[in-house]
């Protein structure tokens, strides 16, 4: 047995002349450990294909991102056109001073939201909502910064004003007691509410979305009740 052991050592030394005596023993022991730790291929699990729902969600996200690249180019001319169309409608009874004060407040975004008032039918309203949500999703894909959250807040604030304006006009025309008696005070309050909204939305993104969805559902319910009567 000892002769066989010496012969094995000599043969290994001949194959590796640069190695010193006894180094092959360490190599053999390391090799043996590796062999013992080898995992059979039959036990290795292959990666599963992506779930169908996950793939569909990724497609929707890609579609929203694609929409977000087109929306700004479309909304800019629409914004300018609607300012021209609704200028006389909104400012019909306003003096020059009132126009300036109203414009310095939130007149610009309210004029744009007048275009959304044309969404009389629920199907068209839903499509506009989807476009704005898609645009917001594209904005949200950018790094989260305060300015980015403000852009998204502007989108949703525009949508809210689209319903706040007709409700305000309705109360003013049918219920005189709802008027404060001072248009300037009313506009200042409106600006303060918008500023408060910005603070809430920027500091707590997503909070307003849930309230906004409930708000839209209530508006649709009120509309259905009025249509039945």
From Swiss-Prot:
Signal sequence interval, chain numbering: none
Keyword Cell membrane: no
Phenotype caused by lack of the gene: Simultaneous knockout of wtf15 results in normal vegetative cell population growth. Simultaneous knockout of wtf15, wtf11 and wtf7 results in normal spore viability.
Membrane disposition: Multi-pass membrane protein
Residue stretches of biased makeup (Basic and acidic residues): 1-26
GO terms of biological process kind: meiotic drive
UniProt-annotated location(s): Endoplasmic reticulum membrane
Record keywords: Endoplasmic reticulum, Membrane, Transmembrane, Transmembrane helix
Presence of the UniProt keyword Transmembrane in the record: yes
GO cellular component, as recorded: endoplasmic reticulum; endoplasmic reticulum membrane
Disordered: annotated segments: 1-27
Residue ranges of the TM segments: 71-91, 100-120, 151-171, 188-208
Organism superkingdom: Eukaryota
Family: Belongs to the WTF family.
Additional facts recorded: Although the gene is capable of encoding two isoforms, RNA sequencing data show no evidence of alternative transcripts.
Function: May act in meiotic drive.
Name of the protein in question: Wtf element wtf14
